[in-house]
Amino acid sequence: MNEDIEYIKTIDYTKSKLNIIANEISSAMNVTIKFEPIKEAQLGYYNYSGGEHKIFVDNSMSVEKQLSVLLHELGHRILHNRENELDKSQARREAEAESFAYVVGQQFGIDTPSGEYILPYIQGTDVKLKDIFEDVFKAVKNFNDKVQMKPMITSFIKYDNDIDNMKKL
């Protein structure tokens, strides 16, 4: 498994690949995804209104950072729907979303700074990592059941290898 992750890390994430990923996620997870400038001091946010799920990501960051933020906000979309939103503290919701981003990011070969964020969210609270991880792993399974990542990643690797081979000519 670790060899697969190291191999995936060779993917050169570009804006076009980010758009392919976003389109796949948007379709599979029933969420509108927008990359645009965000004036507030946040990198992205998830919004549910009028029966529509929306994720906004600040497009002024690197492509890998945008993907990381997209995955964090997608964690909110999957884990924090209207029914269970009030049952969880803000700290727990943020820790869950960041944990989701970390696990799925690893599948994409993206290093997320999740470790820096997860523990501070829950320090000084009664939130237990075990409880967070149970919910996160269910959410990751839900994501993996709906989003066809393997063909997408395989095509990215093939494309990058083809480009590398063309450069050698």
Predicted regions and their residues:
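Non-Sec secretion/translocation targeting segments of pathogen effectors
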Residues: 97, 164-169
